[in-house]
Structures are given as C-alpha cells and as structure tokens.
C-alpha cells in the first residue's frame, strides 16, 4: 500500500499538530477549517490522512494545502483502518502536542484551546469525555448506543489503564507527542485512545466535557456491529500486550480527572 504526501512548505515550527483521518468528508471540511482558523491556538499544522475518498475531499484538501502551508495531505492507495491512518499521520507530526479528531464536525474544534490549556498545565493526555458533568453522548441509534457502552465496559474489564477514565473509547483527544510509542506495523483498528491510555499510565490525564454533535452531512463511518466487535477485541488484546511491554516503566503521579469550565 503506497502513501504520498502533498503540501506547500509547512510552518517552520508548529507547536500543535491536528490529525484528521478522512473518508468522504467533503461536505464538512470547508466549515471545519474555517472554524479552526478562527480559534486562538498556538502555531498549528493540520495533517489530513485521506483513506480513499471519492467525494472530492482529497481535491479540496489538496487545493487548501497549495495556499495554506499549515495543511498537509497524506494519500493512501488502499483502504485501511482509522487507527492505521492516524498513526501514519502522527509519525509525520511536527508539533510538540497532537490533537486527534474527526472531520465530520461531531467533534467541535472549539474545544482545542481547552486541550492546549490542559497540556500546558502539565497533562500528558487530555480526553474529551461524553460522560463527565457537562458532556453528553447526544442522540444515537439504540444499537450504536449498546455497542458503544459495551465497548467502554469491556475496555475497563480487560484493560486496567482504561479504568480511571469515564470515556476510554473517545475519538477526540490530545497528547504530548513525547508520550507516544509507535505501534507495531500493521496494527489495525478504530480506537487509538486505548493504546494512549496504556502509554500514559502513571502520567497526568485530564478529561474535559464535550457534547457529541449530531452528524450534519454524510453517513457514519462506523462499521457493522459484528465487524466492529471482532476488530475491537483484537485491539484490546494488542493494547494489553503493549501494557506488558511498558510495565517496567516507573509509576508517576496518579491519574487525575478534571473538568474544564
């Protein structure tokens, strides 16, 4: 599977790298970038990992990258999982801090300044949680709600690093790049946060509330229930294996959860 990067020259020293795994998000990308530009953020870059879009997403980002050097596009010749695309984008990130979020506007970009604030205050990982006061999972189809809650419960049973947090399967979070441990090549899945919880165990972790917004455009990229469960269980086993690899790391301060208001 090939990978190509297209962009103008990126900023000399971005402090924040925003990772966006994209598949057919052409309807929401213009608004997302307009909202990002309106935020009070440190110098940033956006790395868009396109996983085979056919709706004009990659053409839009390519045009954006030609005029805005903060934007970079990673193109993949074949379909891969969200986790794989995110890890490849993180490998090319240049900022000291990394934000991982969806491009469909269900993750409000206005939360990014709070992420930066908490990272600057010493957190290694900041999680946008639907389950701390002030957060909400929003309206969901019953089957998706059952799968999501089941995934959270299973993570806490099988992965000790997931137990101190309220939303271990959130897809919206930020972390210090120095905390990231590259995963084995070929690791597939959907929930990068499971691995980051292992990587950051014993380091300061914060949770901030967010409202999971209804999807305004396009279709959900969540795979079918049975396929998700199969891949997710493999992810949990791989995260447990990573935990064993890192178990000799000295323990730091206890995990702390906080709500930013």
Residue ranges and their predicted role:
Residues 27-31, 55-64:
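Acidic helix N-cap motif at the loop->helix transition within catalytic regions
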Residues 44-47, 58-92:
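Conserved donor nucleotide-binding strand/loop of the catalytic core
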Residues 1-37:
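N-proximal low-complexity "stem/linker" segments adjacent to membrane-targeting elements
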């Amino acid at each position: 599977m090939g990978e190509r990067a297209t962009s103008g020259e990126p900023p000399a020293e971005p402090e924040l790298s925003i990772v966006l795994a994209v598949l057919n998000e052409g309807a929401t990308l213009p608004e997302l970038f307009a909202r990002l530009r309106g935020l009070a953020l440190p110098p940033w870059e956006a790395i868009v990992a396109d996983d085979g879009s056919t709706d004009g997403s990659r053409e839009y980002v390519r045009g954006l990258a030609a005029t805005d050097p903060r934007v970079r596009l990673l193109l993949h010749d074949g379909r891969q999982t969200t986790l794989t695309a995110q890890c490849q984008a993180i490998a090319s990130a240049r900022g000291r801090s990394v934000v991982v979020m969806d491009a469909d506007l269900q993750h409000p970009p206005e939360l990014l300044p709070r992420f930066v604030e908490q990272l600057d205050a010493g957190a290694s990982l900041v999680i946008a949680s639907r389950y701390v006061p002030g957060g909400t999972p929003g309206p969901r189809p019953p089957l998706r709600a059952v799968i999501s809650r089941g995934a959270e419960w299973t993570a806490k049973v099988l992965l000790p690093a997931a137990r101190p947090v309220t939303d271990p399967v959130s897809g919206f979070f930020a972390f210090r790049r120095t905390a990231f441990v590259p995963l084995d090549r070929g690791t597939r899945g959907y929930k990068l946060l499971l691995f980051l919880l292992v990587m950051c165990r014993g380091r300061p972790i914060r949770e901030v509330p967010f409202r999971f917004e209804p999807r305004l455009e396009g279709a959900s990229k969540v795979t079918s229930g049975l396929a998700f469960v199969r891949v997710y269980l493999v992810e949990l086993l791989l995260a447990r294996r990573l935990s064993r690899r890192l178990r000799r790391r000295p323990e730091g301060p206890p995990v702390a959860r906080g709500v930013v208001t």
